[in-house]
């Protein structure tokens, strides 16, 4: 995939995303349904002087799950401790993290689906009853230690909700699905980022970036950064529609946010398989990508935009894809 359209965070994103991160719900653009629900739950918990129920945030990468976790902590007025599933390799690692929590704190675990099962099992009692029992030592000298924990809120984030075990999923009192962003919301995000970057962006240019951002704020901010470079070197520093079109064309991002590989998938299906159906394994071989990459990185957006559909026989290209790429659509094929 064209790196600029990769929804996973790149090294350059980390510092930038932190500086752009909204602090409270009234600064957070988009995800209105999730925000509305969480605001009610947080206000109710504060009125009862209780900790917020554990929260699961799930959805595709780049949609602001980490940002939402920090907003939750800020709205609660508590500290947040951040870690990731792959970093918690053994129960002792989890115990060390839990032991640092203060009453009411938020513990944010990103990629929670990647925690080892032995760690996950220790987490069950911590989430449900705020205690853990852990074995110390080995053999005849081993002993069980009971550790009481302060009440806390676990916020877990995952791009693979289906990989969570049922016992873990059941312990989250609140589950919030983060969805792809509407173009108008992305336009507002581009404008907000431009203000922080102190770069002038014309309205139609902001919308053009939004339209090509694959419904993802991380990509919108990354595209704005690159277009800003073109505006600085090839223009007068302002980001207008002309410089935006030129920059994104050079960067191989078309009007629908498709990159070279997206187009290659669709063209291969049209030119070789007459639009399909074709099996995902066969398609992956044809475009020289592994099956998982096609399924995880390309297919979801192509389906969401209406260019591709799944059938029992395999994947099929839609009439919209034919028209977008300039092919004549024959319904009988």
Swiss-Prot record:
DNA binds at residues 291, 310, 315. Mg(2+) binds at residue 66. Pfam families: AAA_lid_4, RuvB_C, RuvB_N. Residues 1-181 are annotated as: Large ATPase domain (RuvB-L). It is an enzyme of class 3 (hydrolase). GO terms for molecular function: ATP binding; ATP hydrolysis activity; four-way junction DNA binding; four-way junction helicase activity. Residues 255-333 are annotated as: Head domain (RuvB-H). Homohexamer. Forms an RuvA(8)-RuvB(12)-Holliday junction (HJ) complex. HJ DNA is sandwiched between 2 RuvA tetramers; dsDNA enters through RuvA and exits via RuvB. An RuvB hexamer assembles on each DNA strand where it exits the tetramer. Each RuvB hexamer is contacted by two RuvA subunits (via domain III) on 2 adjacent RuvB subunits; this complex drives branch migration. In the full resolvosome a probable DNA-RuvA(4)-RuvB(12)-RuvC(2) complex forms which resolves the HJ. The RuvA-RuvB-RuvC complex processes Holliday junction (HJ) DNA during genetic recombination and DNA repair, while the RuvA-RuvB complex plays an important role in the rescue of blocked DNA replication forks via replication fork reversal (RFR). RuvA specifically binds to HJ cruciform DNA, conferring on it an open structure. The RuvB hexamer acts as an ATP-dependent pump, pulling dsDNA into and through the RuvAB complex. RuvB forms 2 homohexamers on either side of HJ DNA bound by 1 or 2 RuvA tetramers; 4 subunits per hexamer contact DNA at a time. This is Holliday junction branch migration complex subunit RuvB. It comes from Lactococcus lactis subsp. cremoris (strain MG1363). The lineage of its organism: Bacteria, Bacillati, Bacillota, Bacilli, Lactobacillales. The gene is ruvB.
């Amino acid at each position: 995939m064209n790196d600029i359209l990769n929804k996973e965070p790149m090294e350059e994103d980390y510092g930038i995303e932190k500086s752009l991160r909204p602090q409270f719900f009234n600064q957070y653009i988009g995800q209105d349904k999730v925000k509305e629900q969480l605001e009610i739950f947080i206000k109710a918990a504060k009125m009862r002087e209780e900790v917020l129920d554990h929260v699961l945030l799930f959805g595709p990468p780049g949609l602001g799950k980490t940002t939402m976790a920090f907003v939750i902590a800020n709205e609660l007025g508590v500290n947040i401790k951040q870690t990731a599933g792959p970093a918690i390799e053994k129960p002792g690692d989890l115990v060390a993290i839990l032991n640092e929590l203060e009453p009411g704190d938020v513990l944010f675990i990103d990629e929670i689906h990647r925690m080892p099962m032995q760690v996950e099992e220790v987490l069950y009692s911590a989430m449900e009853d705020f205690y853990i029992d852990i074995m110390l030592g080995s053999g005849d000298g081993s002993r069980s230690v009971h550790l009481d924990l302060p009440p806390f809120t676990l916020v877990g984030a995952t791009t693979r909700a289906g990989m969570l075990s049922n016992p873990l999923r059941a312990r989250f009192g609140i589950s919030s699905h983060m969805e792809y962003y509407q173009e108008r919301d992305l336009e507002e995000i581009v404008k907000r980022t431009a203000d922080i970057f102190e770069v002038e962006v014309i309205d139609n240019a902001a919308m053009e970036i939004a339209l090509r951002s694959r419904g993802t704020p991380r990509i919108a901010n990354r595209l704005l950064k690159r277009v800003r470079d073109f505006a600085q070197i090839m223009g007068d520093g302002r980001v207008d529609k002309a410089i935006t079109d030129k920059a994104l064309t050079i960067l191989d991002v078309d009007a629908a946010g498709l990159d070279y590989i997206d187009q290659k998938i669709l063209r291969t299906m049209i030119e070789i398989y007459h639009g399909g159906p074709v099996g995902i394994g066969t398609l992956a071989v044809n475009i020289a990508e592994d099956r998982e990459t096609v399924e995880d990185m390309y297919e979801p957006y192509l389906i969401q935009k209406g260019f591709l559909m799944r059938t029992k026989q395999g994947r099929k290209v839609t009439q919209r894809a034919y028209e977008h790429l300039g092919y004549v659509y024959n319904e009988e094929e």
